[in-house]
Amino acid sequence: MEGTITALYRFTEKGKPGEALKEAYLIKNVGMEGDRHADGGEKQLTLLSGEARGWMQVQETPGLCFKRYKANLEIEGLAVSNLRPGICLQAGTARLTVTECAKECFQGCQLRENGIACRLSSGGIYLKVAESGTVKTGDPILIL
C-alpha cells in the first residue's frame, strides 16, 4: 500500500507555527534535522493523515489538541488504520518505524465531552527514524 507525502513541517520553537519545507533530512535515531522534537526519543516524528486534517478543518468546535499536535509529515492515500507499532515505512530515502498509534485525548476536550470520536486520535501517528535519508513533498510513502 502506497501513499504520498503532501506536506513537511519543521518546528523550531515551542508555541510557534511550523516551517513548511519542500524537503527535509531525517537523522537515524534522532528525528528531523533542526526540529525541536529531534531528541532521540520514541516520538521523533509525527505523521497526520490528510483525512484527519480535513476532518479537523471542518469542525465547528475545535478539539483541545488541534493546535497542540504538530505534524511533521502530512500524507494522503496510505490507510493509517493499517499502521501498528513496529511497522516499517519507506519515505523518500528514509526508513521509519511506527512507535505509537492513536493519540490519547485530553480531559476537558469539547469533542470528548460531547461524545464525538476525534479522528486525530486515530489519524495521528508517532514515528522513529530507523534509517537516515531525505524526504520531499510528493515522495511516496509505503508500508514495507
Language-model segments: residues:
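Metal-cofactor-dependent catalytic cores
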Residues: 1-144
